[in-house]
Amino acid sequence: MNKGAFITLEGPEGSGKTTIVKMIEKYLSENNIEYISTREPGGINISEQIRDVILNKDNVAMDARTEALLYVASRRQHLAERVIPAIKEGKVVICDRFIDSSLAYQGYARGIGIDEVMAINEFAIDGYMPDLTLYLDIEPEVGLKRISKNNEREVNRLDLEALDFHKKVREGYFKLLEKYPNRIKKINANQPVDKVFEEVKGFLK
């Protein structure tokens, strides 16, 4: 694995990203690879404050473009303050969600347009695209059922969207798999977690 590699994890709600991130952290530590692990939206104080606004269950009136722009603002601050410095120090960056979430959720599922959401993100990311994106694929029904059984996970505004929205999110990710086949790698997240991680490890070497 190259020094300063930027690796992101993507997937619908309940796909198991957080669990896999922890397993990647353990794997990197065992192999003496310097890394930071972070998430979007959030990862730093300013971005976490924006996250609270985005995911607040009371903000049901939020316009789709407002939502997209808030994600972009959070992303820029997170990149500038945490991700870019780590990459420049030669550390591997593991990020739970990044630009592809905006493209799938706001671009496709919200109907703004993948290219349109990409355009507003290009200003924010300033060329910092992931080197590798691991997409954990799961049927929305299964993912949402997992969330409902997980007492430790706080339910947010996006979790409360109708099933049709979550199906569109998955369709959006499939569009991105077609658009970026060299960067985005699809992993079957319906398997037991140890088998999911075996697939993940194959892309980390």
Swiss-Prot record:
CDD domains listed in its UniProt record: TMPK
GO cellular component: cytosol
GO MF: ATP binding; dTMP kinase activity
SUPFAM superfamilies hit by this protein: P-loop containing nucleoside triphosphate hydrolases (SSF52540)
GO biological process: dTDP biosynthetic process; dTTP biosynthetic process; dUDP biosynthetic process
Enzyme Commission numbers on file: 2.7.4.9
Keyword list, A-Z: ATP-binding, Kinase, Nucleotide biosynthesis, Nucleotide-binding, Transferase
Protein's UniProt keywords contain tRNA-binding: no
Catalytic reactions of this protein: dTMP + ATP = dTDP + ADP
HAMAP family (alphabetical): Thymidylate_kinase (MF_00165)
NCBIfam families the record matches: DTMP_kinase
Function, as annotated: Phosphorylation of dTMP to form dTDP in both de novo and salvage pathways of dTTP synthesis.
Protein name in the entry: Thymidylate kinase
Organism: Clostridium novyi (strain NT)
Upper classification of the organism: Bacteria, Bacillati, Bacillota, Clostridia, Eubacteriales
